[in-house]
Amino acid sequence: KSNDKFANLRGLKIFNPENVKTYFNIFKFNVDDLLLFYVGSCAQKQSALFSIRDTKNILAQSIHDYFQLNISPGEEEHDFIIKWMKEFEVGDNFKLEIISGEAYQFIISIVNSETHLADMGMGSVQIMSIILRLACAIKKTKYTVYETGSYISDDKIIDYGPNFEVRKSNIVIMVEEPELNLHPALQSKLAYLFHEVYVNFNISFLIETHSEYLIRNTQLIVKESEYEVSPNVNPFCVIYFDQESKKWGMNYRGDGKFIEEFGSGFFNETRNIIKQMM
């Protein structure tokens, strides 16, 4: 429909009012059911103590949320953090302490030594902020049904309850430049991190990135998982924004390569620099 018809909403009169109401209710239901999380980039220098009232510090808020959720060792969210902080070479374990009810200190264990997270590199600070936020999101998507009942799965009747734990299914995490301050080898691991959260916890992502390494690894995952082989569904969708304010979708082939080409100044920039050096 032409946008001119809806310049002042009078264009709605061309539709059946009952249909408009129905579509609006469907839209409202999906929006109300949608659970959104935001993970921003962590670029500021950190202090050893994180104030519980610091609403401008993304890492401090991530630590505060984790503490408030009362996640204990042995819970899947805690194990998730340990697994990925090792994968990103941050450390082997962590300890969170609250000081006088006013601030937290976050201690990283590396072999037989301990150090404040704030004293580590900015890459470690960035990735721990992301991992903590993801762990909190995973925890918040779960809720407990205290009644008994049943549901059908694979043509089988499954009884549940009481205290049956279920997970919300309409969750989106928005991530801003997750590659900030990370070594290229670690940037590529971000694809595995987000992919695991999607597969294991049914959580979707909307990611803004300039990282070639992250995107390249999604291509490898698509190939290895055969996501472009029917009847599989590819969970990855890449939209490229060109410098000239144009955008287009990047579709994967079965071998993981893209059908479309990126604009100038992205994947070809390294090649252009090498040519100038020759």
List each language-model region with its residue ranges:
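Switch/communication elements of ASCE P-loop NTPase nucleotide-binding domains
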Residues: E77-K83, E87-K275
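Coupling/switch segment of ABC-type P-loop NTPase heads
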Residues: K1-F88
